């Protein structure tokens, strides 16, 4: 995940952008930090989904086969 310092910098740049005073370097930095943040969020979400089992109202496991395979592969490593 992304560090607290980087999140603080993202917020700082966002506030500065609202006032309309970002330089080109700061805009580039903001984009880079946002992408890094999103990658962390996506990775976290994927890990969370890999632990989920989907069950229908009747109690049957209806987890998609692709997700089941990911779980099996994860246990092997």
Curated annotation (Swiss-Prot):
- One Pfam short name: DUF896
Organism's domain of life?
A: Bacteria
Q: Which GO terms describe its cellular component?
A: cytoplasm
Which UniProt keywords are present, listed alphabetically? Cytoplasm
Give positions of region: Disordered.
57-77
Q: Where in the cell is it found?
A: Cytoplasm
Q: What is its main location?
A: cytoplasm
Record's family? Belongs to the UPF0291 family.
Known PANTHER family for this protein? UPF0291 PROTEIN CBO2609/CLC_2481, UPF0291 PROTEIN YNZC
Query: Mind telling me which HAMAP family this protein's record contains?
Result: UPF0291
- Protein's recorded name: UPF0291 protein BLi02035/BL02933
Q: Which organism is it from?
A: Bacillus licheniformis (strain ATCC 14580 / DSM 13 / JCM 2505 / CCUG 7422 / NBRC 12200 / NCIMB 9375 / NCTC 10341 / NRRL NRS-1264 / Gibson 46)
